[in-house]
């Protein structure tokens, strides 16, 4: 026997038993985003490497350590590690945002070469939302309200907490960076080699360190909110007022900076304690300078991304009885002379007249006992049974597989009307 080939570490398959929950979550996402008037876009999973270096920042962990990059002739390409840069590239290239507001969303796989662990994979799936052309804090609040509405739809709203911060303008961050470095230089004895490197290259990233001793020291560090420019402070205060007005609770986290260099002003995360160390389920913020940085006109922008794998884990943890619909509603079994053709005709009739139902035809050998066993395994609600006598009498037997009434025999001409009463 030939040696089997396994999936790449950190890149996982989704089994038939798992996909109904994924589909249900994705359906809730689509429903909420569509209800807010957002439009779906689709971008390639491969982009030019310089796009991410310019957008995310060359000193970030994502660009310096985690990207899957390769050469195609003389062009360096990368599997996308996140979606914002590609969406901005597409918006500039196709003129979607020239003198225009856009509210966009996308869904798809992303890739990062990280150490796989629960909730963190090398191929993972994200829903991303990007808004272009609106500078007011009202849109910041709308995105947060949108995510909260999604949490309610998923039944997880009591298990997530909103954390907010403002990281201000580039100038304000530069002033804060100097103060933070001055403070941290006296505590390098507590730092790992990686943290010492961050102190030089990207000191704000030390704020989300997992080092417990350094976390205690940071409680007394300068606060970014104390260095905000007036515009950023006013923007943040207005955002908080809007959230207060609609009753969305939040915590101001002065250590929240996000991991990508393009953010400014508002940053936010939805976190949970139900998943252990990997507690962030959604994060985003404003990136008002990114469009211009990538060659477009100056355009105020804001967005967020949420990881579907973590949403799946969270829903399974706190809402295990989620009504994930079975992939099959009706299972058609048949045996005997003439039954095959009759079963095919019946299955197609049901599919044509009741397209909202999922109908599976057995299409395999086996007696009725084996076919019913397969029907039970499919999760179907009903089995439609055709044997030789049913063919001769133009009838069909209906068997309830999930309890309920006993089986009954109906004329074929009445089967559609009957099924409409059952679903």
From Swiss-Prot:
Keyword Aminoacyl-tRNA synthetase: yes
EC number per UniProt: 6.1.1.21
One Gene Ontology term from the biological process aspect of the record: histidyl-tRNA aminoacylation
Enzyme category, top tier: ligase
SUPFAM superfamilies: Class II aaRS ABD-related, Class II aaRS and biotin synthetases
Main location: cytoplasm
Pfam families the record matches: HGTP_anticodon, tRNA-synt_His
Classification via InterPro entries: aa-tRNA-synth_II (IPR006195), aa-tRNA-synth_II/BPL/LPL (IPR045864), Anticodon-bd (IPR004154), Anticodon-bd_dom_sf (IPR036621), His-tRNA-ligase (IPR015807), HisRS-like_core (IPR041715), HisRS/HisZ (IPR004516), HisRS_anticodon (IPR033656)
Keywords assigned by UniProt, alphabetized: Aminoacyl-tRNA synthetase, ATP-binding, Cytoplasm, Ligase, Nucleotide-binding, Protein biosynthesis
Domain of life: Bacteria
Any one GO MF annotation of this record: ATP binding
Record carries keyword Aminoacyl-tRNA synthetase: yes
Cellular compartment(s): Cytoplasm
Reactions listed under catalytic activity: tRNA(His) + L-histidine + ATP = L-histidyl-tRNA(His) + AMP + diphosphate + H(+)
GO cellular component: cytoplasm
Quaternary state and interactors: Homodimer.
UniProt xrefs under NCBIfam families: hisS
UniProt family annotation: Belongs to the class-II aminoacyl-tRNA synthetase family.
Protein name according to UniProt: Histidine--tRNA ligase
């Amino acid at each position: 026997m030939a040696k089997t080939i396994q999936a790449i570490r950190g890149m996982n398959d989704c089994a038939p038993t798992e996909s109904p929950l994924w589909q249900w979550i994705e359906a809730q996402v689509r429903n909420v985003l569509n209800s807010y008037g957002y439009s779906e876009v689709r971008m390639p999973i491969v982009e030019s490497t310089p796009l991410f270096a310019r957008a995310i920042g060359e000193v970030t962990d994502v660009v310096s350590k985690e990207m899957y990059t390769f050469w195609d002739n003389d062009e360096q390409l990368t599997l996308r590690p996140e979606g914002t840069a590609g969406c901005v590239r597409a918006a500039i290239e196709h003129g979607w945002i020239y003198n225009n507001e856009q509210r966009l969303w996308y869904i798809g796989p992303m890739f990062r070469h990280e150490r796989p662990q629960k909730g963190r994979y090398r191929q993972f799936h994200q829903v991303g939302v990007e808004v272009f052309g609106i500078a007011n804090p009202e849109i910041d609040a709308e995105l947060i309200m949108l995510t909260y509405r999604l949490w309610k739809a998923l039944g997880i709203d009591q298990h997530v907490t909103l954390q907010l911060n403002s990281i201000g303008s580039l100038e304000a961050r530069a002033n804060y960076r100097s103060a933070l470095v001055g403070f941290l230089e006296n505590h390098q004895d507590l730092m790992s080699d990686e943290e010492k490197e961050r102190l030089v290259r990207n000191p704000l990233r030390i704020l989300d360190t997992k080092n417990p001793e350094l976390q205690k020291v940071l409680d007394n560090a300068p606060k970014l909110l104390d260095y905000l420019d007036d515009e950023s402070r006013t923007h943040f205060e207005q955002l908080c007022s809007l959230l207060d007005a609609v009753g969305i609770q939040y915590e101001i986290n002065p250590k929240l900076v996000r991991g990508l260099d393009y953010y400014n002003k508002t940053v936010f995360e939805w976190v949970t304690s139900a998943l252990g160390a990997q507690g962030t389920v959604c994060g985003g913020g404003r990136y008002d300078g990114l469009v211009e940085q990538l060659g477009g006109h100056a355009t105020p922008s804001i967005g967020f991304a949420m990881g579907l794998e973590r949403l799946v884990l969270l829903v399974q943890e706190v809402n295990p009885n989620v009504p994930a619909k079975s992939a099959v509603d009706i299972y058609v079994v048949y045996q005997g002379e003439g039954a095959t053709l009759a079963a095919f005709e019946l299955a197609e009739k049901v599919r044509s007249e009741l397209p909202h139902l999922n109908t599976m035809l057995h299409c395999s050998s086996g007696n009725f006992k084996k076919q019913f066993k397969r029907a039970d395994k499919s999760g179907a609600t009903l089995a439609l049974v055709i044997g030789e006598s049913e063919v001769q009498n133009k009838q069909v037997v209906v068997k309830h597989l999930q309890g309920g009434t006993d089986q009954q025999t109906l004329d074929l001409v009445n089967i559609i009307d009957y099924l409409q009463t059952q679903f």
